[in-house]
Amino acid sequence: MTRLTRVAHRAPMRLLPMQPPGVAAAGAAACALGSYGGGLLGGDVVDLHVSAECGAVLALTTQASTKIYKAKADGVPTQQRLTAKVAAGALLVVAPDPLVPFAQSAYVGLQRYALEPGASLVAVDWVGSGRVSSGERWAHSSFSTRTELSWAAAGGGSAASPGSGGVAAGGGSAAAVGGDGAAAGSADAATGGGAAEASRPWLVEAVQLVGGPGSELAFDLGETRRDAYATVVLVGSQAAPVVSRFYSAAAALALRRMRSAGGMRGAAAAPPPDTR
């Protein structure tokens, strides 16, 4: 059974411990990430630190899409940073709703994951095209996001001191702290402090989307409307079922597209990759 052992946050971020029936039945812990007002203003900085201890299963979600509001006159972007340490045997799932960048918004995101040997990760980083119902499609000024994965030494310590918020999950009794910066600092002290010992990233994925009126994603997706972009990272044995489902879905979509384009018919899908 996994329990949240430390939770701390301060504006503009909110962390809401949750325990849906399915999560509880799986012996996992869950926490919803949110913000006051349902979105982030230009110049807001969110700095989240997460630690999943040995054998823990932690899910980080949101209750709705996060709006990225129009940048202020100075053009300073909205920033979100996530630093996570996943211990051996632990599974961290980061599955938020998509970001929704408003027209003339500016956003910079950074996700850093340090995994001990035997750790598993399912992480989704995705963005919608904006307020489509209001006629905004990819009308943001700038949008960039970067994901880094690195190996961490076993027992290398907890994630670094939280800025806007921090979450730790492990065994034992649950404890939660929240409120201002002092509370956030005490949460880190209780989990052991110190930065995660990580090597240089072995995987880096970076995306920059330049928006504006009439912009479209420059990907050939056939006749599919391109209203979202996503990066999905799947690592470790506990992520293997998700890998198989993604592979099956991708193969089915590719086959459907080939058939609709008058290409190969009755093509057989290749066997799924080895996820060991």
Residue positions per predicted region:
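N-terminal, charged/glycine-rich beta-strand/loop interface patches
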Residues: M1-P98, A103-Y107
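Short, well-ordered strand-loop elements centered on a beta-strand within folded domains, enriched
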Residues: T2-R6, G27-L33, V57-T61, V94, ...
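Intrinsically disordered, low-complexity boundary segments flanking structured domains
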Residues: T2-R3, R14-L16, A189-G193, F219
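Residues in well-ordered beta-strands of folded domains
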Residues: L16, G34, S51, T61, ...
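Intrinsically disordered, low-complexity terminal tails and inter-domain linkers enriched
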Residues: A152-S199
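A structural signal for small-residue-enriched, beta-sheet-centric alpha/beta enzyme cores
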Residues: K70, V127-G155, G192-R276
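Short acidic-glycine loop/turn motifs at beta-strand connectors
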Residues: A52-G55, A87-A88, E116-G118, W151-A154, ...
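Internal, conserved structured core segments that host functional sites
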Residues: T78-W138, F143, T147-E148
